[in-house]
Each structure stands twice: as structure tokens, then as C-alpha cells.
Design a protein with these regions (language model features):
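N-terminal secretory signal peptides that target proteins for export/translocation
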Residues: 1-10
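Bacterial N-terminal signal peptides
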Residues: 13-24
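Mature extracytoplasmic or organellar-lumen-exposed domains after removal of signal/transit peptides
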Residues: 31-326
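Bacterial Sec-dependent signal peptides at the C-terminal "C-region" and cleavage site
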Residues: 23-33
Length: 326
């Protein structure tokens, strides 16, 4: 029996003097333990669906935001405020504010190389409708002055970073690539996963499983909510087949063999890459004292199987208890 006690547990770790969030989830399971790939065997269960889709798994928007986060961090570290032609601020804001509707927003990290070729070159190849700003915590951050929201705080730091070469303010001890990255991981990625999709959207009345997520969708409300939370976690779909070291090396673009699960010679940045919180979990787990990466990923796989097994019907109270602690 799968038991997931709470998805909103956080482990705080200091990374370069900045708080780094690592999602920790407590789960034990004996049933639904045969699958090792996220998204495996998830048929379309929406009643009355007449389209051509056969797989209900979808978290493209979340992977696009993982790439925007990676790219934003990269461009912050390359800022040249002394060069008036560099347009540093607008480039940074582009990766935070905008959606890649025209498939012209270049993926800056990971970039393709001979040792680690990647399938996609533009963010819009995965999703044309995603940005970071629109998903940032909109509540006032009491720890910051002037009633700034989460999105406001990130913009504030971006503006500061645009005025500093390489994004590091040595005089005031501010490493903006790290500050912006870690704050974005919390205010966007973690916030959306744990305070939205695994919280409100796992209650009975919110995005019910007997209805499509939205009109015409090929996935149910609960199926897609769960998938979106998994996307914000940032693990490759085949993470359960990897060691923590391999998952870490995939994030560092050092292990093509481990990343290329389908053996087509390139890394699919939608399903085969390690990002964000899953990357930090991999880093911690390499020492052998923790098992965050597989604990969380396995619980996501098992929870999705419970939702899929409902076959497009409402989740029972027992199902809801398993996937969400009231």
C-alpha cells in the first residue's frame, strides 16, 4: 500500500552561502512497484475523448520552465554591463518574462556539444506557452521591503545583476547567479509543485479525475496536475534506472550514455535530462547518507499509477488519502 505522508517537506541546505531547496518526500510502497519509468503505461482515460492521443502523460510546460531557469542562470553569469551593445538586462528579462511563441528563445543550458548532443535547441520546441514570471509566487514576501511579490523579488535581483560583470557583486557579497537561481527554484518550481499541484489540486473538488483538465484535453484533472508536479521536480523520466552519481553527471552533461535512455544518440531535454531539485537531490545522495532522489521519484511514479488505475473516474477517498494528506 502506498502511503505518502506529506509532499511539502523541505530540506534546507547551504550552497555557496545561499539556501538551496531540496524536496523531500516520505513514502513507503509494496504495490504499484513494477514500473521504473515515469509516464510508462499511462493510457488516455478521459471519457469521450475522440482525439489521436494514446498517452495521457504531459509536463512540457514544466520542462520549458526548467530550461528557462537554467538559461537565466547562465546569462546572469555572463553579463557585461560595460558593453552597451550587450543588452544584458533585456536578455535576462526575456528568459524570465517571455514565452517562446516563435521558437526563437535559444536554450543556453544545456547546449548541444559533441560529447553531449541535445535534441532541442529552442525552448519553444518543448512548449511555446510557458514562462517563469507567470508562475512565480504572487503573494507579498514579508521578508522583503516594499510589499514585493515573488516575481517582483526576482525582477529586482535581475536588475541588480545586470549592472555587475558576471553577476557577482564582490563588494556586497552578492552572487546573483546563485541568488536568482535558488530563489526561482523556490518561488516558481517548488511553489508550484508543493503549494499548488500537490496541495489544492489534489483535493476532491479541484481538478477532479472524472473530467478533462481543460476542455478538449486528453488528460484528466488529476493526471495532469500530478504530471505537472513531477515536471517541477526535475527528474529524468528514467531516473529509477540511474544511480545518484549518474543522475548528477547527466545534469552536469558528463554522461551521455546514462542520459540517452532511448539510445537515439541525443538527449531529449523533455524526458532525459536532470534539472533543479532533482539535481540537488542527486548531489546530496552521492555520499550514500540520503536517498532523496529515488524516494521522491518513486513516489511520483507510484502516485501516478493510482491515478491512472482510477480509469477516468473520480478518485476515492482512499485514493486521495494515498496521494494527498488532508
Amino acid at each position: 500500500m502506498l502511503k505518502i505522508n506529506k509532499y511539502s517537506l523541505i530540506k534546507n541546505a547551504a550552497v555557496l552561502g545561499v539556501a538551496s531547496l531540496s524536496l523531500s518526500l516520505i513514502a513507503t510502497s509494496s504495490s504499484f512497484s513494477d514500473g521504473h519509468i515515469y509516464g510508462e503505461n499511462n493510457p488516455v482515460t478521459v471519457k469521450g475523448y475522440k482525439g489521436s492521443k494514446t498517452d495521457s502523460t504531459a509536463y512540457t510546460g514544466q520542462m520549458a520552465r526548467q530550461l528557462q531557469h537554467n538559461s537565466l542562470k547562465k546569462i546572469v553569469s555572463k553579463g557585461k554591463p560595460s558593453d552597451p551593445t550587450s543588452n544584458t538586462l533585456n536578455k535576462m528579462l526575456n528568459y524570465f518574462e517571455n514565452k517562446d511563441k516563435t521558437k526563437s528563445m535559444a536554450i543556453l543550458d544545456p547546449k548541444s556539444s559533441s560529447k553531449f548532443p541535445v535534441k532541442q535547441k529552442m525552448v519553444g520546441e518543448i512548449s511555446t506557452g510557458s514562462n517563469l514570471a507567470g508562475k512565480a509566487d504572487g503573494r507579498v514576501q514579508l521578508s522583503w521591503p516594499n510589499n514585493m511579490t515573488g516575481a517582483d523579488v526576482i525582477r529586482f535581483m535581475i536588475k541588480k545583476a545586470s549592472k555587475i560583470s558576471g553577476g557577482v557583486d564582490m563588494r556586497n557579497g552578492m552572487n546573483y547567479p546563485q541568488l536568482i537561481s535558488k530563489y526561482t527554484m523556490g518561488a516558481v518550481l517548488y511553489h508550484q509543485a508543493c503549494d499548488n499541484y500537490l496541495d489544492e489540486k489534489m483535493t476532491a473538488s479541484n481538478k477532479p479525475n472524472d473530467k478533462p483538465y481543460k476542455k478538449g484535453a486528453y488528460y484528466t484533472g488529476k493526471e495532469h496536475s500530478w504530471d505537472e508536479a513531477f515536471g517541477y521536480w526535475g527528474a529524468a523520466a528514467h531516473t529509477m534506472t540511474l544511480s545518484a552519481q549518474q543522475s548528477y553527471d547527466v545534469a552536469k552533461k558528463k554522461d551521455l550514455k546514462a542520459a540517452d535512455f532511448n539510445k537515439d544518440g541525443v538527449v531529449d531535454l523533455y524526458k532525459e535530462m536532470t534539472y533543479g531539485h532533482a539535481y540537488y537531490a542527486s548531489a546530496f545522495d552521492r555520499g550514500g547518507k540520503t536517498d532523496y532522489l529515488k524516494t521522491v521519484t518513486k513516489a511520483f511514479i507510484d502516485g501516478r499509477k493510482i491515478i491512472t488505475a482510477a480509469d477516468g473516474e473520480k478518485l476515492t477517498s482512499s485514493d486521495l488519502t494515498k496521494v494527498h494528506e488532508p
